[in-house]
Regions:
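Catalytic cores of the polymerase beta-like nucleotidyltransferase superfamily
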Residues: 1-472
Length: 472
């Protein structure tokens, strides 16, 4: 950050470092933010001042022009800031009608830095540092709130100005361990319905430089369960993800689960975070059991069951949950590849490792592919860690140990043939034997691979060609 600051000073602007960069600096954390406030210049003036130093582009959020992004000509600075450096003039609210949401944010270069700080989201983000002197501008006590790990809005208008801040507040709870004050909780409950007004890209798919929205950042924090409970208790969760509605308070009536579906979900998400698992696994944890209320049916044993049963429940909770995940992730504009990956985890999360022998491990890799195989194991591990028995027993340690042994077997079998490209023959070899390109050829290759997965010693050219002749 020091190199970036020196570069910005060299541009001849009276700039202030603002937002997350100052907050993280005061917390002793590394920051990737490079946001600067420049009083005395409007957006056009900023563009003219920055244009000689590189490529400039408008910075637009929620259809509002909020500043200018500079992609420096300096290769060293460009390497430090691949997404560019953001500059903005001071801004203020202007009323556009009688309603409480009827206003817009406009640039006002005559506004003081202190007044600009007063229209930001939270006090911990309303601190600026002047590059020229190092002076801190902290009109709202943000530094004291940082020391107390306290989260406060700058005003009652904060969530109305931008409802995304409802999710950002939750993200700070998860990511930075902040405690929301009572007034903020009241404001969240009042403004929760407004979160539906926020575009999906800003919540999920991400318009930020790192390509992640606030929900993803929340899940990647260290305390996502605390944030999700807060989201539930303030009403934000059900507004953001209505798929959660039937799951909240749903009693699973199972000897394996003493937790309601929502509490089990939060426990699984937290376990995935504690284990450092990937974003796809954490997203799958969020959705994996949401299909249970819809799929539930009561058996002759008097208990609820969640698997498919012809004539009673056409789809098990895994399929229902996968559909719910697909719809929610699409609505939140998650990238297609990530969405498909999460949906597959949810759809297949009920797999059982069994005895965990080498053949089963190879079949598991064959069916799921390398990436999804370990996603499923990671998710299963988190799912087991999030279980509590009816008497409050701890997670099932025997199942966890069996799963972790299976993971090691799968890891060892990665070098064994389990993909079509691992076969000692290919489609051209079979065409030379008289197979026709098309479904017949595909079925033959699949049969050869299945045979090799079960018996790797078969994976020689001669043996596979001989076996292929039998399939013609």
């Amino acid at each position: 950050m020091k190199e970036i600051e020196e570069y910005v000073r060299s541009l001849g602007l009276d700039a202030y470092l603002v937002g997350g960069a100052v907050r993280d600096e005061l917390l002793g954390l590394e920051s990737k933010d490079a946001d600067f406030l420049v009083p005395g210049l409007d957006t056009e003036g900023l563009r003219a001042a920055l244009a000689p130093h590189g490529r400039v582009e408008d910075l637009v959020v929620a259809d509002r022009l909020v500043g200018i992004r500079l992609h420096s000509r300096d290769r060293r600075i460009r390497g430090l800031t691949p997404a560019g450096i953001e500059f903005a003039p001071p801004r203020k609210e202007v009323s556009t009608g009688p309603g409480r949401h009827d206003f817009e944010i406009v640039a006002d270069p005559t506004l003081s830095v202190e007044d600009d700080m007063r229209r930001r989201d939270f006090t911990v983000n309303a601190i600026a540092r002047r590059l020229e002197t190092g002076e801190l501008v902290d009109p709202l006590g943000g530094r004291a709130d940082l020391e107390a790990r306290r989260l406060r809005t700058v005003s009652a208008q904060s969530f109305r100005e931008d409802p995304l801040r409802l999710v950002r507040a939750l993200r700070f709870v998860s990511q930075l361990g902040f405690d929301p004050d009572e007034e903020l909780l009241v404001q969240m409950r009042e403004e929760a319905p407004a979160v539906k007004l926020v575009s999906g890209e800003r919540v999920g798919g991400g318009l930020a430089a790192d390509g992640m929205g606030e929900l993803s950042k929340l899940l990647l924090g260290s305390e996502p369960a605390r944030a999700l409970r807060l989201a539930r208790d303030t009403g934000v969760l059900i507004e953001l993800l209505p798929e959660f509605g039937p799951a909240i308070g749903f009693d699973q009536e199972s000897r394996h689960h003493d937790l309601t579906v929502d509490e089990h979900t939060f426990a699984v998400v937290q376990a995935a975070a504690d284990e450092g698992y990937s974003l796809p696994v954490r997203l799958a944890a969020l959705f994996h059991d949401l299909g249970k209320p819809q799929a539930a049916w009561r058996g002759s044993d008097g208990r609820l069951h969640y698997y498919a049963k012809p004539g009673i429940s056409e789809r098990g909770h895994d399929r229902v949950g996968a559909d719910l995940a697909a719809g929610a992730l699409s609505r939140l504009r998650y990238p297609n590849a990530l969405r498909r990956r999460v949906v597959r985890i949810v759809r297949r999360h009920m797999f059982q490792p069994g005895k965990g022998d080498e053949r089963r491990a190879r079949r598991f890799l064959r069916r799921n592919g390398d990436e999804l195989a370990f996603d499923l194991i990671d998710h299963k591990h988190a799912d087991l860690l999030g279980k509590r028995g009816t008497e409050g027993e701890p997670p099932p340690l025997d199942e966890i140990e069996r799963l972790l042994r299976f993971r090691e077997v799968v890891r060892r079998e990665l070098s064994s043939p389990h993909r079509l490209r691992d076969l000692a023959v290919d489609g051209n070899d079979l065409i030379a034997l008289g197979f026709r390109a098309g479904p017949q050829l595909g079925r033959a290759l699949d049969e050869l691979l299945d045979a090799v997965v079960d018996e790797p010693a078969l994976n020689s050219r001669d043996r596979l060609l001989a076996r292929a002749k039998e399939l013609r």
